[in-house]
Amino acid sequence: MSAAFQPSLMMMQRPLGSSTAFSIDSLIGSPPPPAPGHFVYTGYPMFMPYRPVVLPPPPPALPQAALQPPLPPAPPPPLPALPGAFCPGLAQGMALTSTLMAALPGSFPASPPRPEAARKFAPPGNFDKADGLPPPDGGGGGGDDGKTGGGLLPFPAADAVHASLAGALRGGPKDDPKAEEEAKGREENFSMDSDLDYSSDENGPAPAAPREEDCGTALEENPPSAANAAANAAATGKNRRRRTAFTSEQLLELEKEFHCKKYLSLTERSQIAHALKLSEVQVKIWFQNRRAKWKRVKAGNASSKAGEPSRNPKIVVPIPVHVSRFAIRSQHQQLEQARP
């Protein structure tokens, strides 16, 4: 048996004269050939927010590589040991490297905290679903607190803030038209009533009403026009206030009261409304419009060329369309004859 193993032993011995050709550094110092399953390319960042390509499990490692402790990081060698698995593109190479590191947690001591680093770089909620990595344990308190405090918690908080802002913006414009209408009604009341009319402002702001006394005669002689106006308002969709068609008796009584007293108290207004079968709001608005007309007449007389108000101021009354020209001429003749 010794004769059988003699050539092999002779081959293992080092020749004495060849110290320069064979040395301990040349036998031990050279790194072992990299295994295809355990190769790690350290020239690029290990984890990037790309979805890694799933590879089949690597073949079992060689016993020499398993027994030998991991070497310190060295400059990256060329890539002849990985046939056809890596593309020349940068993104695929980094993704395959992260997959290999995740698939070999036992042979590398620094592999457990690396999925947390990958979660920090990756978009929240996509890394665990795509790769199927288990959630981190409770032991890594500092990493979890930093991750949840910096990455995940601001999203629901921001959603709540946006929802509250959107609700406030939606609810805001609903109250603005009411406030504008109230302010507009107050301004019109204040402009129609002078500062001496304290009684007519106690019922609250009333909507701006048309001047019934300007066309009261027309409405009373031509009632279908009011119905047509109401129908047109309903057709156009605008909620306009319907004009009040006063009768001749009501207009006569209102004119008498206005000549006696320009401003009414609450008691007088209620009494007139009850006597004429009108509402207090109708009486109030009629007096407001009549006062506005009276003030316009006074202002026109004051700014006339003569400088002094005329004794018989002209009050223009709108004439209905259906009245004939002959009636208008006869009316003018009667007015001219009545004047001295």
From Swiss-Prot:
Keyword Transmembrane: no
Low complexity: bias regions: 226-235
Stated name of the protein: Homeobox protein GBX-2
DNA-binding region(s) in UniProt: 239-298
Intracellular or extracellular location(s): Nucleus
UniProt keywords, alphabetically: DNA-binding, Homeobox, Nucleus, Transcription, Transcription regulation
PROSITE patterns: HOMEOBOX_1, HOMEOBOX_2
Region called Disordered, residue ranges: 106-155, 167-242
Gene coding for it: GBX2
